[in-house]
UniProtKB/Swiss-Prot annotation:
This is Serine/arginine repetitive matrix protein 4. Splicing factor specifically required for neural cell differentiation. Acts in conjunction with nPTB/PTBP2 by binding directly to its regulated target transcripts and promotes neural-specific exon inclusion in many genes that function in neural cell differentiation. Required to promote the inclusion of neural-specific exon 10 in nPTB/PTBP2, leading to increased expression of neural-specific nPTB/PTBP2. Also promotes the inclusion of exon 16 in DAAM1 in neuron extracts. It is found in: Nucleus. Residues 190-202, 291-301, 390-422, 430-461, 522-549, 565-580, 596-611 have a biased composition (Low complexity).
Length: 611
């Protein structure tokens, strides 16, 4: 300790010399040195004092005077201070050190000297361990919490999440040095203890920089980390092999492919989201969505988010996000939302045919629809599968008619039906294998068709279909999935998201409460009409996603609006809206007659809403 103290003392003297030189009126160094030497009894606390003194630049002059004129007085003052600090423990004093030193850091000379002194001091004396900057501490906590929550979120039972976890662990181990860096910046203590030399250099570098710069760098670090995480999650997601090609596909035709079957879309979107969105944010969103979108597959929400991000139209993105919020809808909803522009045209394709199909298909029961679905799958597969969800059929049929009217979409419609098609599929992928098998069968076509099918159209029909169908089979699956997700959902991450504005949107996706905002937001603009339809759609459908009935109601509402909007939005679509309305009313009456309790209620609510 003696040698350490001596070194510190020398540093201290040098530092004071520099400080006083820097300060307006340099005091005779000899006096300062003399005062320092006179204070030999306190060599140990001197280092601590020096930060205290330097911390006050203005006062430092006075101090210099004091030292020159009345060293004893200063000594007593400093002694008190040192005693106090010693009581607090040297570590504490170190923290004082650090807290106080930043202010003077504005002066170049002082900054440099201080940083060197501190560096040495840190390495030699273990004061650094307690040396936590308060400001940094909070940020550290946040970051740590984020990483933990991510870990926790991803450490869910599902194999996919497990896989993701493993990947993340691997990645984290790779990127841990970086993370530790970041934390090191926040956590001088551990830094100094564990890797003193490196941290100290890091620290000195940071200290050399202005505090703002340090923060910036820290931010950068965190961004990088999040980026790695981002990459991670998409990779993990892409680890689902089947959906990888789809991902590629989705990426190629992000809008169209968004319609890609659930898992593919999910993955692709997830991947896309990191790709398209700013990395850090997208990752957060990704995970957040993953966690937060309970009803639908989180991936779907993430996917839709990625698509949102990827998709050129901002409004659409938002709505997509919302859609993804229902991920059950999200596949459709956001799919529709993203291609909505496309969808407008497709929808125009044959509103009449859509109406026709909805008419024909709606009438049949689920079984009939399913039979039809099987028989039609090739040709009318889109519409019939939709019908296949005959119970969804009223919606699905309208939807499917829309799908079928867009022949490319028709296939999508099956996807829809199936996966509600995609969304179900997504769900089924993550949620229920049994469903998945069925939707899986159709899902490839659905995927392709979905991308083909206008997302907006998808949106409509999926929501309808989704409602009734989901209400039954999917509602259970969804319940299951939701329970699982919910477990994951309410993680610290979620809480943090609640606090930070950047996550508000994701949160909205998750919570029905918030959804009304997007629900209303889109209505104003006609270009927004697409996005707004999508948005409404997604908001209403996601909102109702959990309750298929309410979902269908809000969806129908949003659908009605979006369709109207769509018609107003695109003249080509405008014919379609009428037919759509027709098919919708038809589906309404049909679903009513069908009296599948859920379908019925959804149709009823739907019709009532529409009215």
């Amino acid at each position: 300790m003696a040698s350490v103290q001596q070194g510190e003392k020398q540093l201290f003297e040098k530092f004071w010399r520099g400080t006083f030189k820097a300060v307006a009126t340099p005091r005779p160094e000899s006096i300062i040195v003399a005062s320092i030497t006179a204070r030999k009894p306190l060599p140990r606390t001197e280092p601590q004092n020096n930060p205290v003194v330097p911390a006050q630049d203005g006062p430092s002059e006075k101090l210099g005077q004091h030292l020159a004129t009345e060293p004893l007085g200063t000594n007593s003052w400093e002694r008190d201070k040192t005693c106090r600090e010693l009581g607090a423990t040297r570590g504490h004093s170190a923290s004082h050190d650090k807290d106080l030193t930043p202010p003077p850091s504005s002066r170049g000379k002082k900054k440099k000297k201080k940083s060197t002194r501190k560096k040495r001091r840190r390495s030699s004396s273990y004061s650094p361990s307690p040396v936590k900057k308060k400001k940094k501490k909070s940020s550290k906590k946040h970051k740590r919490r984020r990483s933990f929550s991510k870990k926790r979120r991803h450490s869910s039972s599902s194999p996919k999440s497990k896989r993701r976890d493993e990947k993340r662990h691997k990645k984290q181990s790779r990127s841990r040095p970086r993370k530790s860096h970041r934390h090191r910046h926040h956590r001088c203590p551990s830094r100094s203890q564990s890797s003193e030399s490196r941290p100290s250099s890091c620290e000195s570098r940071h200290r050399g920089r202005s505090p703002e710069e340090g923060q910036k760098s820290r931010r950068r670090h965190s961004r990088r980390c999040s980026k790695t995480l981002c990459k991670d999650s998409p990779e993990a997601q892409s680890s689902r092999p089947p959906s990888q090609p789809l991902q590629m596909l989705g990426y190629l035709s992000a809008r169209g492919v968004i319609t890609g079957s659930g898992s593919a879309a999910d993955l692709f979107t997830k991947t896309a989201s990191p790709l398209t969105t700013s990395r850090g944010r997208s990752q957060e969103y990704d995970s957040g969505n993953d966690t937060s979108s309970p009803p639908s597959t989180q991936t779907s929400s993430a996917r839709s988010r990625g698509q949102e991000k990827g998709s050129p139209s901002g409004g659409l993105s938002k709505s997509r996000e919302l859609n993804s919020g229902n991920t059950s809808d999200s596949g459709n909803s956001f799919t529709t939302s993203s291609p909505q522009n496309k969808g407008a045209m497709l929808e125009n394709l044959s509103p009449t045919s859509r109406g026709r199909e909805s008419r024909g298909f709606q009438s049949p029961c689920l079984e009939c629809a399913e039979v039809k679905k099987s028989s039609l799958v090739p040709s009318t597969a889109r519409s019939s599968p939709m019908k296949g969800c005959s119970r969804s059929s009223s919606y699905a049929s309208t939807r499917s008619s829309s799908h079928s009217s867009r022949s490319p979409n028709p296939r999508a419609s099956p996807r829809y039906t199936q996966s509600r098609s995609t969304s179900s599929e997504k769900r089924s992928y993550s949620r229920s294998p049994s469903y998945s098998s069925k939707s899986g069968k159709r899902s490839p076509p659905s995927r392709s068709s979905r991308s083909r099918r206008s997302p907006s159209y998808s949106r409509y029909s999926p929501s309808r279909e989704r409602d009734p169908k989901y209400s039954e089979k999917d509602s259970q699956q969804r319940e299951r999935e939701r329970a699982r997700r919910r477990r994951r959902s309410y993680s610290p991450m979620r809480k943090r998201r609640r606090d930070s504005p950047s996550h508000l949107e994701a949160r909205r996706i998750t919570s029905a409460r918030k959804r009304p905002i997007p629900y209303y937001r889109p209505s104003p603009s006609s270009s927004g009409s697409l996005s707004s339809t999508s948005s409404w759609y997604s908001s209403s459908s996601s909102r109702s996603a959990s309750r298929s009935y309410s979902r269908s109601r809000s969806r129908s509402r949003s659908r009605r609006r979006s369709r109207t909007r769509t018609s107003s939005s695109s003249s080509s679509r405008s014919p379609s809206p009428g037919s759509r309305s027709r098919s919708r009313s038809r589906s309404r009456s049909r679903s009513r007659s069908r009296s599948q309790s859920r379908s019925y209620s959804s149709a009823d609510s739907y019709s009532s809403t529409r009215r």
